[in-house]
A protein has these predicted regions:
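Short glycine-/aliphatic-rich beta-strand segments at the starts of folded cytosolic domains
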Residues: 567-574
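Condensing-enzyme catalytic core of the thiolase-fold
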Residues: 137-564, 583, 590, 594, ...
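Short, low-complexity connector segments at domain boundaries
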Residues: 3-6, 102-150, 181-183, 197, ...
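C-terminal active-site-capping segments
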Residues: 1-33
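Conserved S/T- and glycine-rich ATP-binding loop of Class I adenylate-forming
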Residues: 9, 88, 429
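Phosphopantetheine-dependent thiolation modules in NRPS/PKS and related acyl-activating systems
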Residues: 22-33, 44-131, 512
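C-terminal catalytic ATP-binding subdomain
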Residues: 17, 114-119, 547-555
């Protein structure tokens, strides 16, 4: 449907069933705006002159404008932008489009555009867009992972937590239970992250007032997605205006409920602050990317559905990089009240998946993000591939016993479809990270479906090992699928299956003797080359949407090792603030003491594959040990390192 409006906003015409065909080859001649003839070209730095004009029109509040901050964020309005355009025309003797301030919305981008015009290049410059090549059957590479889960602020911390079976459940503080009455009875235990309200709004170019109105799920996603991109070695400037997709699963309306019930009520930022579309849209806007941007809500399968959609988008060449994740923050009592009345919650807050004492699921919160690329592209660009996604499938329970009742045959059909899409035989799969919520009804249904789909077709195969991360960090609801995927990636990467937490006695409602399945009562080695380790991941939404993903480990092609450095190498670090730089240096000290990478590679990545900030530090050394010693010496003599007072909510060094 196409709607046409006039300048006053009145609907003039409407067209339905319009089809648009776009050719794959996109080489377009873009005419430059006409120059005003016989006018003298200005001298001096173009961007400095733009900044000076901004200061004139906005005032002293914009005396030193950030060249990468949007004009509206700096204080211009749609009305003042018109005057700004006229000032630019007078200053640079150019005839500019009325939309120039919208098309090039920062000093740097506008400056680059005007510099091109002033260089008297040809009026038409061909712009080639690499549309990529669809690859329906291609594998998708996981090139980076980042997370903020209960007591695990990184994938490495999550792996350690699972091996040690750390208990993450605790009482929910009253500040998280907005709307609850003291006399109400419902389970008040959950697995929570530390200070979800912490946020460095200045880093993300957001005003303090707007940040307060933002759902913490938006804030948390921004931070974790940034860390994932840093881990992938993709600087922000490489993403600008590129086909980068953002796919995120989210389901909680807690913050909206909290705002509507507060004395302050709604403000001008409530719309974007509480909108699900803004969860992805804000990240795409901050990064300046132009790929698909979709917030997905299929309840507990939301983030794994986002993985499925992102992989299909990459294979169809709709995007070249996909930022995929899930987020869930507990900010009110509403779900505790509802699920408590339904009898779905474990009284002690623990998801005792597959155990005989299973009595409901324990709630959890957090955020996980992965960076995906087509495998061929990731290998070509020498990205650090963690695992490869072979295929996936999504379906619905259909007409079953009830809207929220799992459907075993539907789960079997789902797994069979995923296997076919991935080109994998059931016997090749040795491990499944199950949905496994610890409910009386759900666990036996899922285990039976896993046996039927994976081992009836290959009865001579070894038992299929089944596990669930929900017993470690709780059921993260919309973010549960991404947590399961990250765990599965760690399992195939390390070749080791973590023990199933809170497993005392296998569920006696399950006929284990008739099933070719087993549980990890203790840590188990998974021998063989990484690419031989094939795992499945399941997520089921409580309204019937089911997803299954198949992935395997990855071995990078052998390359000749770099010769030992014959001269000192320079390690260049940068961060947005002095405190963050000190924290980053400390993290590098720990990293350099444990890494097996050569110092040349580390220094190259730090310089070329990280976003550069204004606070810089350079140290040199012959090897990793000397680099770490140089950083320690700087930290010992740095006032900010010795007396660090980080900003509130500053959780990552890169922020």
């Amino acid at each position: 449907q196409v709607l046409v409006y006039d300048a006053q906003g009145n609907l003039c015409a409407q067209a339905n069933d319009v089809a648009l065909s776009v050719p794959q080859l996109a080489q377009v001649a873009v005419p430059a705006p006409a120059k005003v003839p016989a006018a003298a070209q200005p001298v001096g730095d173009v961007r400095a002159q733009i900044g000076a004009l901004l200061t004139q029109i906005i005032g002293v509040a914009c005396a030193d404008p950030d060249p990468d901050r949007g004009f509206f964020e700096l204080g211009l309005s749609s009305i003042s932008l018109v005057e700004f355009k006229r000032m630019l025309e007078r200053q640079f003797a150019l005839k500019l489009s009325a939309t120039v301030g919208f098309d090039y919305p920062t000093i740097n981008r506008l400056g680059q555009y005007l510099e091109g015009l002033l260089s008297r290049e040809p009026a038409s410059t061909p712009v080639t867009v690499d549309a990529g090549a669809p690859d329906a059957a291609g594998s998708v590479a996981v090139v980076a992972m980042a997370c903020r889960f209960p007591q695990a602020d990184s994938p490495e911390a999550l792996w350690k937590l699972m091996l040690e079976q750390t208990d993450t459940v605790g009482p929910v503080p009253p500040s998280r239970l907005a709307g609850a009455k003291p006399e109400e009875t419902f389970p008040r235990f959950a697995s929570l992250i530390h200070r979800p309200e912490g946020f460095d709004e200045a880093f993300f170019r957001i005003s303090p007032k707007e940040a307060r109105s933002m759902d913490p799920q938006q804030r948390l996603l921004l931070m974790v997605a940034w860390e994932a991109l840093e881990r992938a070695g993709i600087p922000q400037e490489k993403l600008l205006e590129q086909r980068v997709g953002v796919f995120v699963g989210a389901n909680s309306h807690d913050y909206e409920t909290r705002v509507l019930g507060s004395a302050q009520g709604v403000d001008a930022h409530y719309g974007t602050g509480s909108s699900f579309s803004a969860i992805c849209g804000r990240l795409s806007h901050f990064l300046g990317v132009r790929g698909p941007s979709l917030t997905v809500d299929t309840a507990c399968s939301s983030s794994l559905t986002a993985i499925h959609l992102a992989c299909n988008s990459l294979r169809a060449a709709e995007c070249d990089i996909a930022i995929v994740g899930g987020v869930n923050v507990i900010a009110s009592a509403s779900i505790f009240q509802s699920m408590g009345q339904a009898g779905a919650l474990a009284p002690d807050g623990i998801s005792k998946a597959f155990d005989d004492s299973a009595d409901g699921y324990g709630r959890g919160e957090g955020c996980g993000v992965v960076i995906l690329k087509r495998q061929a592209q990731a290998e070509r660009e020498r990205d650090p591939i963690v695992a490869t996604i072979l295929g996936s499938a999504v379906n619905h329970d259909g007409a079953c016993a009830g809207l929220t009742v799992p459907n075993g045959p539907a789960q079997e059909a789902l797994i069979s479809e995923a296997l076919a899409n991935a080109g994998v035989h059931p016997g090749q799969v040795s491990y499944v990270e199950a949905h496994g919520t610890g409910t009386v009804l759900g666990d036996p249904i899922e285990l039976n479906a896993l046996h039927n789909a994976y081992r009836q077709a290959s009865p001579d195969s070894p038992p299929l090992t089944v596990a669930s991360v929900k017993a470690n960090i709780g059921h993260l609801e919309a973010a549960a699928g991404i947590a399961s995927l990250i765990k599965a990636c760690l399992v195939v990467e390390h070749g080791r299956i973590a023990p199933q937490a809170h497993l005392q006695r296998a569920n006696t409602r399950v006929d284990w003797a008739a099933m070719n399945l087993k549980l990890a009562h203790q840590a188990m080695d998974w021998p063989g080359r990484p690419e031989s380790r094939v795992a499945g991941v399941s997520a089921f939404g409580f309204t019937g949407t089911n997803v299954h993903v198949l992935l395997k480990g990855y071995t990078a092609p052998a390359t000749a090792p770099l010769p030992p450095a014959t001269a000192p190498v320079a390690l260049c670090l940068s961060a947005a603030t002095p405190a963050a730089l000190a924290e980053l240096a400390q993290r590098y000290v720990s990293f350099l003491g444990a890494t097996e990478h050569c110092p040349q590679t580390i220094c190259y990545n730090a310089l070329v594959r990280r976003t550069a900030f204004k606070e810089r530090l350079v140290v040199h050394g012959q090897d990793c040990r000397e680099l770490a010693q140089a950083l320690q010496a700087w930290l010992a003599g740095s006032p900010i390192a010795n007396d660090r007072k980080p900003a509130a909510g500053e959780p990552w060094a890169t922020l």
